[in-house]
Regions:
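Accessory alpha-helical/coil subdomains and C-terminal extensions
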Residues: 1-2, 7-76
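Catalytic cores of large soluble enzymes that bind and process phosphate-bearing ligands
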Residues: 36-40, 44, 65, 69, ...
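Hydrophobic/aromatic beta-strand patches that form the interior of the parallel beta-sheet core
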Residues: 60, 93-94, 132, 185
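Short, ordered loop/turn segments at secondary-structure junctions
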Residues: 64-65, 97-99, 134-137
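Short glycine/threonine-rich loop-to-helix capping motif typified by GTGT followed
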Residues: 70-80, 86, 101-115, 141-149
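Conserved mixed alpha/beta catalytic, RNA-binding, or beta-rich assembly cores of soluble enzyme
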Residues: 92, 96-126
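Internal helix-turn-beta structural module
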Residues: 117-203
């Protein structure tokens, strides 16, 4: 009887909601409107490339449509660094877009922090190489960080701090791991949001 009452109540609410919506005036097209796109993930990648070029790196745009599991993207960027490290060229591999994280643990972090941490093992022992990833709005997940940074010394530093990269990733606790080794990127709110950008620097 209770189920029947609530079912009838829900249908009644739905009926009146639809009735009121259908009685509203249809929105009219606005006149004298100009729409301009003032920022995009492509422009974010272009700006990242310009910054890298100013530092003497040759930028390579991998994609501005990055959309996969964060740890897979990080592992891939780490492998790119490993492949090209020591080749005598200063290269900056850039990937823009937005990755995802499927939660398996109870830790703290965000997709950019997880991406960076996932690259740490591939970079282990390398000199003058790093991977970092940041959210353009200055916020990554439910944290105060914009993203994360790892280099050839990160994995050893994590081990010394009693942390294992793979166990940390399984617990989705990239924030505390990177915090322990100075790998968090903190920018504060930027006032914009055009996805994320990840950069792998190689020498």
């Amino acid at each position: 009887m209770l189920t029947c009452f609530y079912g009838t109540f829900a249908l009644g609410t739905l009926y009146w909601t639809l009735h009121l919506l259908l009685r509203q005036e249809t929105p009219k097209a606005l006149t004298n409107v100009t729409t301009r796109i003032t920022g995009s993930v492509r422009e974010l990648c272009t700006a990242a490339a310009a910054a890298c070029r100013a530092l003497g790196y040759e930028p390579v745009l991998l994609t501005d449509r990055l959309c996969c599991e964060a740890r897979e993207a990080g592992s891939f960027l780490g492998s790119v660094v490993r492949t090209h490290a020591g080749g005598g060229r200063k290269l900056a591999y850039i990937a823009g877009g937005e990755t995802v994280v499927h939660l398996t643990g109870k830790g703290l972090g965000g997709r950019n922090q997880e991406l960076a941490l996932a690259a740490a093992s591939a970079l282990a022992g390398l000199k003058h190489c790093c991977v970092f990833s940041v959210g353009s709005d200055g916020t990554d997940g439910p944290t105060d960080a914009a993203g994360g940074y790892v280099d050839g010394e990160t994995e050893a530093a994590l081990r010394a701090a009693g942390r294992d990269v793979y166990r940390t990733l399984a617990d989705n606790d990239a924030y505390h791991a990177l915090q322990a080794v100075g790998g968090l990127i903190l920018t504060g709110a930027t006032g914009t949001n055009v996805n994320d950008v990840a950069v792998a620097l190689v020498e």
